């Protein structure tokens, strides 16, 4: 666990998804709570609950494992998460330069003056901000 709580959150979700774990436990901060709410709303997570141990709060998230059926059999889709703006190199954009992830199939999470939101919400509100991560 480092100082970058967003990278810790994304890495925990990515590792749990690769190891086919059902749940992920991450430290609860305002930023991680907002990102997890967006992931829940967009359908990348199944459920989230807040858990307290001693004096610390944790978010326990249940991952959504989607299985697709093809002619060759059933395969599990993976969730890809990529950290864009990091503490050593911040990436900012205006609303016209907000990237579309996979041509609109994925989402970009932005930190704006009106809070943390997806790329679609930021385009509708016509505001830019710091590009935190891509999820597809």
UniProtKB/Swiss-Prot annotation:
Keywords: Chloroplast, Plastid, Ribonucleoprotein, Ribosomal protein, RNA-binding, rRNA-binding. Signal peptide: none annotated. It is found in: Plastid, Chloroplast. The keyword rRNA-binding applies. It comes from the Eukaryota. One of its GO terms (molecular function) is structural constituent of ribosome. Coiled coil: none annotated. GO terms for cellular component: chloroplast; ribonucleoprotein complex; ribosome. One of its GO terms (biological process) is translation. Belongs to the universal ribosomal protein uS8 family. Part of the 30S ribosomal subunit. One of the primary rRNA binding proteins, it binds directly to 16S rRNA central domain where it helps coordinate assembly of the platform of the 30S subunit. This is Small ribosomal subunit protein uS8c.
């Amino acid at each position: 666990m480092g100082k970058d709580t967003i990278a810790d959150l994304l890495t925990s979700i990515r590792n749990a998804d690769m190891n086919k774990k059902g749940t992920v436990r991450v430290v609860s901060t305002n930023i991680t709570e907002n990102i997890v709410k967006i992931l829940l709303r967009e359908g990348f997570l199944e459920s989230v609950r807040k858990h307290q141990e001693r004096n610390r709060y944790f978010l326990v998230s249940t991952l959504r494992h989607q299985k697709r059926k093809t002619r060759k059999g059933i395969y599990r889709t993976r969730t890809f998460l990529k950290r864009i703006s990091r503490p050593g190199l911040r990436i900012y954009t205006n609303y016209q330069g907000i990237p579309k992830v996979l041509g609109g199939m994925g989402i970009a999470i932005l930190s704006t003056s009106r809070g943390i939101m997806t790329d679609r919400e930021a385009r509708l509100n016509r505001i830019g901000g710091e590009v935190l991560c891509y999820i597809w």
